[in-house]
A protein has these predicted regions:
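Internal helix-loop-helix
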Residues: 2-52, 56, 60, 109-114
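Gly/Pro-rich turn-and-neighbor structural signature
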Residues: 2-3, 39-87, 92-93, 100-101
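Active-site-adjacent "gating/activation" loops or surface patches in catalytic cores
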Residues: 4-12, 19-21, 62, 87-94, ...
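Short acidic, glycine/serine/threonine-rich loops at helix termini
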Residues: 8-13, 40-46, 76-81, 105-108, ...
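Structured core elements
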Residues: 66-68, 82-86, 94-96, 101-103, ...
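Short Gly/Pro-enriched turn/cap motifs at secondary-structure boundaries
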Residues: 73-76, 106-108, 125, 161-166
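A short core secondary-structure module
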Residues: 92, 96-146, 150
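A glycine-rich, basic-preceded beta-loop-alpha segment at the flavin cofactor/substrate interface
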Residues: 101-103, 140-156, 161, 168-199
Length: 201
């Protein structure tokens, strides 16, 4: 979207570049691929203030994105997730929990990492009907768009894999991390499918 610094070209144009980059280094390509997915999810479901604050830096390549779904207790059955989101007086949420197998979960290639995290907000129903979507930056972003203090997100470990070793697959710990709800409460799983459909199909 040119509004946020993009060129507005169709996917058919970028597909040629994607093919070359994937053939050269799939490990490196995954960093940008996850960012594209996070960008599209924020573009489709977040409010204008959030879009203006985060999307331009993601388009520039200064900030990257991730998709935080899987937990030690749940893989495909996301209705069992344990990560909690407690609303604060300022409208933000404190995110607490652990996510595993997070592609591009941590790196020093970009100035900030924008994690899209599914969690269960207070008083939400059990199962998939009680999942909400949150934007949790590695570093808090100030109102003027500059990077502030480190958020409560840390890397527990990096997985040792048989292939695609240049792509960091991480365990991420969220310890009262500041999160911002995207879209309506309890609609997070359907919103996250905007990103999942792009990344996994």
């Amino acid at each position: 979207d040119p509004k946020y610094g993009g060129q507005g070209m169709p996917k058919t144009v970028s597909a040629f570049f994607d093919e070359m980059l994937s053939a050269t280094s799939l490990s490196f390509k995954l960093y940008s691929e996850l960012t594209i997915g996070a960008y599209n999810c924020i573009l489709r479901h977040a409010d204008d203030e959030t879009k203006d604050k985060y999307l331009p830096k993601m388009v520039e390549g200064k900030w990257s994105g991730t998709m935080c779904l899987t937990e030690p207790v749940c893989g495909t059955d996301l209705g069992m997730l344990k990560t909690k989101a407690v609303e604060q007086s300022d409208g933000t949420h404190k995110i607490s929990g652990q996510k595993i197998f997070i592609t591009s979960g941590d790196q020093d290639l970009t100035e900030n990492i924008i994690h899209l995290v599914i969690a269960r907000a207070s008083d939400s129903p059990p199962g998939t009907k009680g999942i909400s979507l949150f934007l949790v930056p590695k570093f808090i972003v100030k109102d003027d768009g500059s990077i502030g203090t480190r958020n409560g997100v840390s890397t527990g470990s990096v997985e040792h894999k048989m292939g695609i070793k240049g792509s960091a697959t991480c365990v991420l710990n969220f310890d009262d991390a500041v999160g911002y709800m995207i879209g309506p409460k309890n609609k997070g799983l359907s919103q996250m499918f905007t990103m999942m459909n792009l990344e996994r199909i």
